[in-house]
Amino acid sequence: MDPLKPPREEFEKFVAEVAYAIGIGEVPEIERSKRFGYFSAKFHKYRVDAGKLKETVDSLKSRQFKYLTSISVDGLYLNVDLAVEKVAELTFRAVAEMGDKYGFTDECKIGSFLVEHTSANPIHPLHIGHGRNAILGDSLVRLLRFCGNVVQSHFYVDDCGVQVMYAAIGYNVVKKYVDEVLKRTKPDVVIGAIYSAVNAIAEINRLKKELEKEKDDEKRREIINEIDSWVSVLKRLIDTEGEVINKLVEVLGQRNIVEEAAELNKRYETGDPEVKKIVREVVELVLKGQRETLARLGIELDSWDYESDIAVWSGEATRVVSELRRRWPQYIDDRGGAVVFRADKFVEDFKLWDVLDLPKFIPPVTLTRSDGTTLYVTRDVAYALWQARRGFDKVIRVISTEQTHEQAHVRIILYALGYEDVAKKLIHYAYEMVNLPGMKMSARRGQYISLDEILDEAVERSADLVKEKNPEIAGIIAERVGVGSVRYAFLSTSPRKPIEFKWETVLNMRQNSGPFLQYTYVRAYSILEKAQEIDLKKVAIPKEILPEERELILKVAEWPSVVREATRALRPDYVAEFLDGLALIFNSYYEKAPVLKTEEPVRSFRLALVNSVKTVLAAGFYILGIPTLTKM
């Protein structure tokens, strides 16, 4: 139920009458007015005389309107304001009838969706960048579900590839020590340290061999500096997990880890039972830790899709390569045993840029290594086919802009294989990075800020905000405020813009933050808790209302259109921006207008208005995943 639908329809009907009267064969579009009034219709493209437009409007506007007022003409704009008391009646009735589903309209029910998000490598904890991915993906799921769409959330477990094998090699060496460490440390943190240490050892071993062969003094100095940087990585890791890391150095110090990892990966792809056991053990440990982190954020996934099962052991990735060879041999190159698909030439020949929404530059793509093992893109094509077979209208993949070319390659290969429909319904939901001032991240070197660390600090800082008022439950409140602050910080910016993560913004209690919205909700809740129950359908609208009340009524009435627009555009940030605007108006109103100590009928009207604001905030919190609070 949309309170603004009847006023809009009444205005559209009037605009149609005006258009007919001045001889226009179509009805101008209605838009929100940026000039005068609430709605506007532009007559610019119809070569209408402004004087004739005004004369026609003046002759037609004298009749009685139910929802419209102040009809005027400004140049070639036809403007109208709304009878706010009538909009208030529509809004209160909609809130009363729909409750926490207020905002839903049939127009935002747009299909069925498979949403893949997070999909972090199972070799270390989720870091701050994964946090943006996970929260964006989860909020898309929530937004689409709020609108009645069928949605499934999926996590792609990338358990193949050399990176995972590095972690498996290290874990296999120190397995008996790890059990003790796991009693005090999250499993993803432990495996992350092992992975970084094995990387460091592998690089040191490789660089030492280079140093033995190098004769040039300048190049030798460069190699020595690089060795020193990797040694410093090991020292830092030893400071946290000394026994485990020292054992890795002792056992792996002289081994060719690069070759071992490649061989292990080949054995894993062929389904070697011994390798499968150790790799899956490592992967499950990391996923256990990652699930715990996601649970703190209120994120649950419907399906965990293992790359090995879907793309490799099924033979699907191999079939992708062989089918491309069969269909398009002229676009296949063999380079030292590796198979390369000339995606650049294929796109040029078939002019696919607009068809598949591709970036201007498309490089060739390598499908297999020289040893025959598949690469990420090949396996991802196999996964895309698996996703398509789930039968959803659209598949949304929340993946950073860094993988724009990889995701373009997936769509190109699907098209080349004859799956044009699959390629077109695959949406790469791209997002930019999260920047922490003064921090450069590298998972290989173990240099990253984990999502848990961000959440812990958010909770600690939030505790300082709430412990004075509610010391007995400060810990519970701080956790919910901390989670809300992080979720809002990642959702309040357009996905295509980088985020500069600053605590003074994230925890700003005056505007544009999760805690600000939560505090606004608490204010509304507290008023209603002290008041008697009211019948929203029978609230009398006062003849005189405050400017802030007018603003609030129209703002609350706009909620269904915001949800509709956010759903169609897949933009949770529209919801965040709207809630911030609503909270700013409400807090200004809260300071100026007493509610509980006001005489009737104004008291009931204001309570109905407060309840409507609270209802919208609660619905928005569900979509954004922000925890609600009754005390703060």
UniProtKB/Swiss-Prot annotation:
Motif 'HIGH' region: where in chain: 120-130
Pfam families reported for this sequence: DALR_1, tRNA-synt_1d
Chemical reaction(s) catalysed: tRNA(Arg) + L-arginine + ATP = L-arginyl-tRNA(Arg) + AMP + diphosphate
UniProt entry keywords in alphabetical sequence: Aminoacyl-tRNA synthetase, ATP-binding, Cytoplasm, Ligase, Nucleotide-binding, Protein biosynthesis
GO process terms (BP): arginyl-tRNA aminoacylation
Annotated InterPro entries: Arg-tRNA-ligase, ArgRS_core, DALR_anticod-bd, Rossmann-like_a/b/a_fold, tRNAsynth_Ia_anticodon-bd
Enzyme Commission numbers on file: 6.1.1.19
Secretion signal span: none
Keyword Ligase attached: yes
Molecular function terms, GO-annotated: arginine-tRNA ligase activity; ATP binding
Localization per record: Cytoplasm
GO cellular component, one term: cytoplasm
Family from the record: Belongs to the class-I aminoacyl-tRNA synthetase family.
NCBIfam families recorded: argS, PRK01611.3-3
Protein name according to UniProt: Arginine--tRNA ligase
Organism of this sequence: Pyrobaculum islandicum (strain DSM 4184 / JCM 9189 / GEO3)
Taxon lineage: Archaea, Thermoproteota, Thermoprotei, Thermoproteales, Thermoproteaceae
